[in-house]
């Protein structure tokens, strides 16, 4: 949301009114979710009104999930961990931190975030459930099972 330039997109910070956000940027997401029911959406690198989109719980949970009825999984843009805080992103509702990692880049901070209460275990479970639901949906579709 609010990332409409390629140059310096990891440093872009959009400041805009609620009206502009909803009428210009969010309207296309609302239509896409209503018409196409996407399996996933991706947060951008940029910040919007002071919050990195990957960390924006109000945007992910309040607008996309509650208002627009989005039921798929949310993923970060590629290598967003150098922009957004992993713990805040998971708590906001990011289900998949792309591209993933074979080291401790994600795992240790997430475990510690659960232990110290910065990540609600219910939210983490919900994030995993969103991914598994789409995996199951795709497998069933591939097998021709309803």
Residue map of PLM features:
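Glycoside hydrolase catalytic-domain context in secreted enzymes
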Residues: 1-146
């Amino acid at each position: 949301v609010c990332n409409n330039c390629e140059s310096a997109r990891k440093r872009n910070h959009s400041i805009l009114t609620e009206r502009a956000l909803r009428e210009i940027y969010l309207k296309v997401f609302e239509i896409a979710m209503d018409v196409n029911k996407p399996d996933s959406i991706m947060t951008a690198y940029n910040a919007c009104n002071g919050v990195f989109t990957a960390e924006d719980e109000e945007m992910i949970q309040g607008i996309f999930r509650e208002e627009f009825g989005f039921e798929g999984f949310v993923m970060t843009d590629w290598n967003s961990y150098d922009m957004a805080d992993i713990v805040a992103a998971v708590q906001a509702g990011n289900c998949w931190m792309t591209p993933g990692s074979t080291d401790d880049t994600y795992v240790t901070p997430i475990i510690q975030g659960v232990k110290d209460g910065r990540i609600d275990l219910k939210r983490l479970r919900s994030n995993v459930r969103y991914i598994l639901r789409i995996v199951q949906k795709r497998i069933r579709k591939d097998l021709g099972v309803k």
